[in-house]
Amino acid sequence: MLHQFYPDYEADSAYGIDYRTLYEQGYRGIIFDIDNTLVPHGAPATPQATEFFGRLRELGFQTLLLSNNKEPRVKSFADAVGASYIYKAGKPGREGYLRAMEQMHTGADTTLFVGDQLFTDVWGAKKCGIMTYLTKPIHPKEEIQICLLYTSPSPRDKRQSR
């Protein structure tokens, strides 16, 4: 079960992945998370993002933005970079990922996912058999951390158990 939380690959940034090699390996569709993967949370598309999506199209990739955000946020970003989109995707549920592949006319073996969150982005993509890249969040302060901590019983707990 835990293997579903491990990304296939990790990258410092979505912008630093070798997409040319991935295209040569047969990948044809890329699903991206937006916030903290491509831009800071809530930020509009940057010139860097717009140029980046243009280069991906030149390589031959289909691109799609998959977000749990509402349509105005996702549509405005998608329009700016020239990508397809699915809003209120319900990540980590499978439906959004499956719809994304359907829209791009790709299968799990020709699609990859790029995102910054283990418990939504990576888990959802892995449940669909999609190769995953986990990126470092653009703004680590905004990253949602889920930590499993071991805490020893407090002295009070020890007294009550006697």
Locations of the language-model features?
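Non-catalytic pre-domain segments flanking phosphatase-related domains
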Residues: 1-32
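Short, acidic/turn-prone active-site loops that include or flank metal/cofactor-
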Residues: 88-94, 137-140
